[in-house]
Amino acid sequence: MFVDSVEIIIASGKGGPGMVSFRREKFVIKGGPDGGDGGDGGDVYFEVDNNTDTLASFRGTKHHKAKNGAPGGTRNCAGKKGEDKIIVVPPGTQVFADDKLWLDLITPKERVLALKGGKGGLGNAHFKSATKQQPTYAQKGLEGVEKCVRLELKLIADIGLVGFPNAGKSTLISTISNAKPKIANYEFTTLVPNLGVVSVDEKSGFLMADIPGIIEGASEGKGLGISFLKHIERTKVLAFVLDASRLDLGIKEQYQRLRLELEKFSPALANKPFGVLLNKCDVVENIDEMAKDFCAFLNLEVQKLEAFDLEPYLGFLHPHLTSDFENDPNEKSALFVLPLSAVSALNTHALKFVLLKALP
């Protein structure tokens, strides 16, 4: 089950009480105080685990508390520190307290202290003085800290797929990555985001994210899109997947409406580097004319695709992709316009190299 938002209560442990005791030895009638200090309460940590990509483990477990410190002992023995509470979360988890961002947990294996445990109380040995040789007082341990927090998951991926329902995003990610999403010939097959690892060669690869299809009004809460648009906010490059075979809505209109929804949701998201994939090109007779017209619409110089062993359709590759220059993360024009077919794997192998090269 994919869960990307939960509310939990976290609490550090209470400090253990100090001990009231006196030294008892043979031939010593009134030994001095030897009460030990209480142990500190356990701390609460968040730890990032790369082996999970959901917050589902928190369903049904609302309270997460560290252990209390142990009481001090006799003979100046300090109590044991309370056991820490380690809360494991996937990369990309944001922790909100009082509706304000408190922690942003991104790096795998990162461990961040959230709450410090209460200090253990001092034993009566600390309170001996010239006028008080037999103190019968020891401190209580300090209380721990309790906090109600909201965990929000924003998946971390290099490439984010954006498109209308049934555009072929799930088929594409299943073709070029290790992801195995549900695929069917109807809209809204994808109900949760999918992450896939794309292996380009033995040394190179990247992460791709596919979110449920966006519909008009997604930025205002319609459909499933707004719930998951946040999962592509961290991506480095967006790939608009357009259905070239669709008769009721042309590729220019698809692109314009998708971009409008992104701009409404987040201007920063809409300004990310991007490319365009003209999917289902194998069932379109005039794909070259369609690509030529679309490139003109984006003010791009159409070209015959030859690099990366692409099929020789008309399309566009930014000069950065076919040179040794590094990509500009602030590039505003499209990085690529590629006809492909996810079903027949047409240009999908070459797409891996194009996307890898497109990453800043």
Curated annotation (Swiss-Prot):
GTP binds at residues 163-170, 188-192, 210-213, 279-282, 341-343. The keyword Zinc does not apply. It is an enzyme of class 3 (hydrolase). Mg(2+) binds at S170, T190. Transmembrane segments: none annotated. An essential GTPase which binds GTP, GDP and possibly (p)ppGpp with moderate affinity, with high nucleotide exchange rates and a fairly low GTP hydrolysis rate. Plays a role in control of the cell cycle, stress response, ribosome biogenesis and in those bacteria that undergo differentiation, in morphogenesis control. Monomer. This is GTPase Obg.
